[in-house]
Amino acid sequence: MRVMLIQPPMYHLKMQLSPNLGLGYIAAVLERDGFEVQVVDAAAESLSFDGVIERIRAFNPSLIGAGGQTPVSRRSMTIFGRAKEEISRDIVTVAGGPHFSFADSESLAEYPQLDVIVRGEGEETMSCLCKRVAAGEPLDDLRGIS
């Protein structure tokens, strides 16, 4: 199964970029588990939303993950919405990071394009989640998700 992890675009005139280590850690765990993973750091690559959508289309993942802190949370939802509208409604969308961990119920109610939220540290939860999605198993009793 293919998984894409995305750091959303940022549009600040002056900003200091630092790598999103969380996405790297999650990618390493998923690769260890045999998943084909691509990380897209739209901020570092100066990608627009259109550029991110093209990357998703080219890679054709079954699951996309994004999230982060509150300032980029809506950008993640823009990516999820466009991916489901323009590529496939079957793409499983997963958000994580501080914003979604603390506002999980509100986020799921506000964003219909959001399928799952991983709360807290995501490495092992994402591993279990991806294994279940790949096997077509239910997620109901999976710990660490909303």
What are these regions (language model features)?
Residues 2, 29-146:
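Glycine-rich beta-alpha loop elements in corrinoid/cobalamin-binding modules
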Residues 2-14:
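Nucleotide-activated donor-dependent transferases that construct or modify glycoconjugates
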Residues 12-23:
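Glycine- and acidic-residue-enriched helix-capping/strand-helix junction motifs
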